[in-house]
Structures are given as structure tokens and as C-alpha cells.
Curated annotation (Swiss-Prot):
Family annotation (InterPro entries): DNA_helicase_Holl-junc_RuvA_I (IPR013849), Hlx-hairpin-Hlx_DNA-bd_motif (IPR003583), NA-bd_OB-fold (IPR012340), RuvA (IPR000085), RuvA_2-like (IPR010994), RuvA_C (IPR011114), RuvA_C_sf (IPR036267)
Region feature Domain III, mapped onto this chain: 152-206
Residues covered by region (Domain II): 69-147
Primary gene name: ruvA
Gene3D superfamilies per the UniProt record, alphabetical: 5' to 3' exonuclease, C-terminal subdomain, Nucleic acid-binding proteins
SMART domains noted in UniProt: HhH1
Protein name (record): Holliday junction branch migration complex subunit RuvA
Major location category of this protein: cytoplasm
Gene Ontology terms, MF aspect: ATP binding; four-way junction DNA binding; four-way junction helicase activity
Keyword DNA repair: yes
Region: Flexible linker, residue numbers: 147-151
An annotated GO BP: DNA repair
Length: 206
């Protein structure tokens, strides 16, 4: 399993509607498939880059899919685990919606937002929202986050917890982040605001 590649950015480009980057690692070029949003944030050709990768192996192909943040890689892995969601559709979803927007759309059952991605129809959007929310809710219970007391029963806390889990943060990190930002977020009822604050705090810790 190749979890990341770091080396010189050799080339980037589109192919068959998909974006990719070739990373030169010790003289070996790794083709890493990604989406336009990631390509737009890459350094210049010849500069060092690190991409967090997920390898998908099929009978006729072995492909690397890469992202600038480990959380986006984890989210991509969650997406392609859903029946009917392949790598191309997973990349289309991440290109259309930023990771936090995508997670919120899934948790809130916003199938209209999910269907904005090319190739994602209404039925696929419904299945995606249903399967991932159910899976993340079970993960949340098993992680112990649901035992946090009265706060855990609130809609905002639940959605933020699930979103952070989907982005690849560990349960312990989620608890610490929410405890840290709670005083400043008192009275705030917008999930997006809580999510931004929690991610900002977690980024500062790294």
C-alpha cells in the first residue's frame, strides 16, 4: 500500500476528462490521478510535492489517486466504498464540492448538491447520502463520541463530529477540537462555523 508519494513534480495534465500529476521519486515517475481543484494548488513543475495517495487495484489496472491533504484521501476512500461510486465519480464529487461542503451535503442529505457533480444522478446521490451517513453514525458510536453527554445529542455537535471523522480525524482529535473551540462558539448554531473553527484548531496543532 502506497500511502503517499513525495518528490519532484514532473508534469501535470488532463486525460480523458481526468487530471493527473507525475511525481519523480528517485528517478521513477509515479502517475497520480486527482482532480482539477488539486492540480490548481500544486507547486510549479520541478518543485517538491507531497501527495497523500490511495491505491486502487483492479483486474486490468493499478492506479494511484492522490490529494494534498490526508483528510481528502480518507474521504475519497469513503466515497469509492459506496456501491456504484467508482474513482472517476469520486473525483468528480471532490472537484465539484470542497471536502467540508461534500461532507455536509452527505450528512444533511442534500442530494441536490451531490447531484451537481458530473455523472451523479438523483438515485446515486440518495444512495451516497444514505450509506455514508449510516456508516459514519455507526463509526461515531463505536468510537465513543456519542458518550460525550448532552452535547452529543445536539444536531450541530453530531454533524460536526461525523464531518471530522469523515475527513480522517481520529475520535480523540475530534473531542479535543470541540472542547477547545466550544467557549468561543457559544451560541453558534451553524454546523459550518463549528466545522471551520474545529479544522482551524486542528491545523494549528499539527
Amino acid at each position: 500500500m502506497i500511502t503517499f508519494v513525495r518528490g519532484m513534480l514532473a508534469e501535470v495534465g488532463p486525460r480523458s476528462g481526468q487530471s493527473w500529476a507525475t511525481v519523480d521519486v528517485g528517478g521513477v515517475g509515479y502517475r497520480v490521478w486527482t482532480h482539477a481543484r488539486t492540480v490548481g494548488k500544486l507547486p510549479r513543475i520541478g518543485e517538491e510535492v507531497k501527495l497523500f495517495t490511495l491505491m486502487i487495484v483492479r483486474e486490468d489496472a493499478m492506479q494511484l489517486f492522490g490529494f494534498l491533504e490526508p483528510g481528502e484521501r480518507e474521504l475519497f476512500g469513503q466515497l469509492v466504498s459506496v456501491s456504484g461510486i467508482g474513482p472517476r465519480m469520486g473525483l468528480a464529487l471532490l472537484e465539484t464540492l470542497a471536502p467540508t461542503e461534500l461532507v455536509q451535503a452527505i450528512l444533511q442529505g442534500n442530494t441536490r448538491a451531490l447531484a451537481l457533480a458530473p455523472g451523479v444522478g438523483a438515485k446515486t446521490a440518495q444512495r451516497l447520502a444514505l450509506e455514508l451517513r449510516s456508516r459514519l453514525s455507526k463509526w461515531r458510536e463505536e468510537s465513543g463520541l456519542s458518550a460525550m453527554g448532552a452535547r452529543a445529542s445536539s444536531r450541530v455537535y453530531e454533524e460536526v463530529e461525523l464531518a471530522l471523522l469523515a475527513l480522517g480525524f481520529a475520535p480523540g482529535e475530534v473531542v479535543r477540537a470541540l472542547d477547545a473551540v466550544a467557549p468561543a462558539m457559544a451560541g453558534e448554531e451553524q454546523t459550518e462555523a463549528w466545522l471551520r473553527a474545529a479544522i482551524a484548531w486542528l491545523s494549528e496543532q499539527g
